[in-house]
Amino acid sequence: MDYGAHLPVIDFGSRKFSLQRLSAYVRTARDLGFKAVLANDHLIYSRPWLDAPTALAAILSDSGSMAVGSVILAIVRGPVPMAKALAAIDILSNGRLFVGFAPGSSARDYEIVSINYDERWKRFDEAIQVVRSLWSGDSVGFTGHFYSTAGIDLEPKPLRKPSPPIWIGSWGSDAGLRRVARLGDGWLASAYNTMPDQFAAALSKLRDQLKIFGKDPASFPNTLVTMFMYITEDNAETERVLAETLTALLNRPVEQLRERLLVGSPEVCAEKLATYKAVGVQRVFIWPIKDEVEQLRIFKQKVEPLVDP
């Protein structure tokens, strides 16, 4: 199991957004040996949220050889302009882009762009096919109920051929795992929505679905994203972070988040990660909620060695 780092695109109230802050974070992740950086996406949220594709483009020159990715709202962004923007990021990163697509769980993101939230799953399936069609240069194109690429020749196309890998988010439902197997190049699981035993059960189902769609389960990658993190030996600080920051942000009870996220001592955090490693998680994207540069260092110095001695 290896590790990536979420970009600090949420304002938790401790520091202002700046290019210098993002750059320092990414350079630190690069120098510490993180394998990838990832920007998650919302148009509006309970806290201010920096635009994900813009943030990702801004840090390319600091990212070295790390993979760069975004878990992006494929429908809300619009599949054609999104495909255009992501193709540019792949070119400017010299082919290091991977794309995470998810419909999102916030109805407000849909309301503000006048898209029916109840249509999201049908639109989502089509949006993925639209992006693949545009990136591959498919002469036939794609025509669905909501979208069509007929007559569109989107240029320039991504550097990576036939396209950057498309990973699909699923919390582990049967329908979601079928979608991952049918349309995806990898599976994005959510840390705060997926306990290790749930991940193990979902991974078993996913492998069955991959066989149905003629894909090799052994070579199909997975990753655990949104692993919010604050490493501290201070028990009172642990409780403050859980109760005052993460519960409000994620709308989950404290006890659930205490079980699932990396909040607490290095030993506690390492034990949680070891459990995910044991059930087949291949990569975990950590998301420090404050003191982010120092938290990256603490993670590498005090947590990772306990997981991978």
Placement of each model-derived feature along the sequence:
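N-terminal beta1-alpha1-beta2 module of alpha/beta enzyme domains
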Residues: 1-62, 162-164
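Hydrophobic faces of well-ordered beta-strands that scaffold small-molecule active sites
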Residues: 3-7, 37-39, 67-71, 97-101, ...
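Internal, glycine-rich beta/alpha segment that forms the wall or movable "lid"
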Residues: 78-183, 204-206, 213, 218
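Short, acidic/polar
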Residues: 16-29, 82-85, 170-179, 264-275
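Alpha-helix-loop-beta-strand connector modules within alpha/beta enzyme cores
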Residues: 50-70, 127-130, 300-309
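C-terminal helical cap(s) of enzyme catalytic domains, especially alpha/beta-barrels
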Residues: 128-132, 197-207, 292-309
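N-terminal small/glycine-rich loop or linker at the start of catalytic domains
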Residues: 1-14, 106-108, 147-164, 235-260
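Active-site mouth loops of central-metabolism enzymes
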Residues: 6-20, 72-80, 162-172, 255-267
